[in-house]
Amino acid sequence: MSYVPGIGRAPFRRRGEESPVSARIKIILGAVAYIAAFHWAYATILARSYDYEGFKFRDDAAIISVTWLLALVPSFWMPSRLTRPSQLAYWFFYLVIVVPVAVVTIHSYPGDAHSGILTAVLIVSAFAVLGLIYAVPPAAIPHHRFQPHGLWLAVLLVSTLSYGLIFSVFGIRFNFGSLSDIYAIRAEYKTIVENTSVYISYAVDWQALVLNPLLIILGLISRRKLLVALGAVGQFMIYSFTGYRTVFFSTILLLVLFLLCRSRDRFGIRVLLVLTGAVAGATALYLWFGSLFLGSLIVERLIGLPGLLTGFYFSFFGDHAKMTLSHSILRGIID
């Protein structure tokens, strides 16, 4: 919040600028709405339709109160407006990691609820410590801007290399199966990757998770439709042989994110309301029409699974040796 000091009088806010108290109240109320919507979706969709994956519901008032408390506490310090790029990631951590951990991990932790609560407390505490960085003014570091032609040359070279590896194995194809066939497509992709070089999977991941999204977001910012089209076509092609729905819907997600970031002063409440509406809409769609299409994409995959897998991870590696990076290309050094 910026203020203009006056001589001999108190500082005042710019006209139309929201007060810190008002902005904080909106963030807290938005968080309450989001947590309530996710609790509703969890009890209605995840604990019923996806119980075979490990989603459980502990019908205990004390446990439910703890989930509410741990999920809501971070809203008291979450940034209401974007002033640093990293705050976008910080909000992402809160919405799809901290809240799911506070709810799902406690309900579904293997064994007793106490271990799940302890895990959630540790995660929320670590998240709070991470947020302390925003209390420190940014250091005056000299910026060496990357020249545009250098950026495009780097993107072109890396994309050419990764697409060359991808085309050598999968060819150029746009065979879109139905969303119900993705598991067969994924199984085929996994088999191919296991029988080829590990660098193929790295090339696919870099193109799908870094380079194509970079083209899309740069195209949106600069209003260059060709860049958006190139990135989107690349994502659809990669989806056609991987079956990863995250890749398929990434273009839409980036567009929504771009629209949310256009108003950085109200980013916090906007992203809370958008995700609350998405979760509530997915739950209503399931109750009214029995469809799990949005429930699977938003409630289970995007929000629910991070909380579930966090509990599984802590439970398993609490009693077993850590893998570190022994599954990666560094296995020769780690093993």
Language-model features: locations:
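Perimembrane helix-loop-helix junctions
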Residues: 254-271
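Helix-loop-helix junctions and helix-breaking kinks within/between transmembrane helices
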Residues: 104-119, 233-259
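Transmembrane helices and adjacent periplasmic/lumenal helix-loop junctions
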Residues: 242-247, 284-292
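Transmembrane helix interruption/hinge and helix-loop junction motifs
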Residues: 222-225, 242-245, 264
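Membrane-interface loop/short-helix elements at transmembrane-helix boundaries
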Residues: 292-335
